[in-house]
Amino acid sequence: MRRAAVWVLHVGSCMDASLPEPLRLKEVPVILNGGSGDGHGDEEAKRLEEAFRKAGLEPRLWPFGPGEEVREVARRALEARPPVLVAAGGDGTLSAVADVLRGTDTALGVIPVGTMNHFAKDLGIPLDAGEAAQVIGTGRCIRVDVGEVNGRAFINNASLGIYADMVRKRERQQRRLRRSKRSAMLWAALEVLGRSRRLDLRLEVDGRVQECRAPFVFVGNNDYAMEGFVIGTRSRLDGGLLNVYTTRRCGALGLIGLALHALFGRLRQADDFMQWSVPHLRVESPRRRLLVATDGELNSMETPLEFRIRPRSLRVIVP
């Protein structure tokens, strides 16, 4: 079983501008998810230790177990009220730490060592661990929005339907067949698209009710580009609104057609594509519980689902 760990670094305090010179050194916990991506935990730890030292930072390793414990470690780290808490991992790890940090004065530092690293990419944080470590000591703090569904935070997106089914099947393939995350996701996508089903939902958007039968509902923390070669990216994370996307199309051919609309920059012109920008969304279903994927992590949640945006509730160090 891979191990994960917490590092402690000595860095300067964080402000909503350029970081000051480290005149008063503080201990800052850095959470490392040794299971992110396809790397091995021990090798990854050694690489990160070297990257931190090249950045002039002094790490100390605190081992911890996998899963939800990352939130407990983050809470314990916050007891000392550090100015910066650094998370090294994928979007799931960052999301868990952000869930603890939101609404506090502690800033999130990001070392993106996961598989997709969407949050880091959208904020312009280097994907190289050494360069990202430099940012932690020399960058600036900004405030970004955090999404929430039934009290659970997400920094990128939350979705139900097709993608949640894909995550469930991906996790099963990783567990049973020991496939890599990327390979398992590809096989899961092929399986789900071949058997896609609709969800009977009642959406309350901006005080209006929308009855729909949809293969998915995608809720983004801010607006996602849905067209062309920048599809799936965000130009800002402080717009103060959730962006909700869904379609009435179902079946593999219908979804492929939707994807082609996106590729040619015509997604918003597709007849069955729907989008709303709102601070709050309520999703009702005949089902007592629904599977919801939040930043790639699967959760079974009681209905109705209450989605909210928490504007500028998270401080993050960026270049």
What is the predicted role of each segment?
Residues R3-L85, S95, E131:
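ATP/NTP phosphate-donor binding region
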Residues P22-R24, K46, K54-A55, F64, ...:
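Catalytic core of DAGKc-family lipid kinases
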Residues R197-L199, R213-P215, D238-N243, S277-L281:
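A generic structural signal for short beta-strands and their flanking turns/coil linkers
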Residues D16, G41, V205, R236, ...:
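ATP/nucleoside-binding phosphotransfer catalytic cores, i.e., glycine-rich phosphate-binding loops
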Residues G34, A88-G90, I111-V113:
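Glycine-rich beta-strand-to-loop/alpha-helix junction loops that act as flexible
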Residues Q174-S183, V219, A225-G254:
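Gly/Ser/Thr-rich active-site loops/lids in small-molecule metabolic enzymes
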Residues G92-V97, H118:
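Short glycine/serine/threonine-rich phosphate/pyrophosphate-binding segments
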Residues R152-G161, D165, E211-C212, F216-G220, ...:
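Short hydrophobic-aromatic micro-motifs
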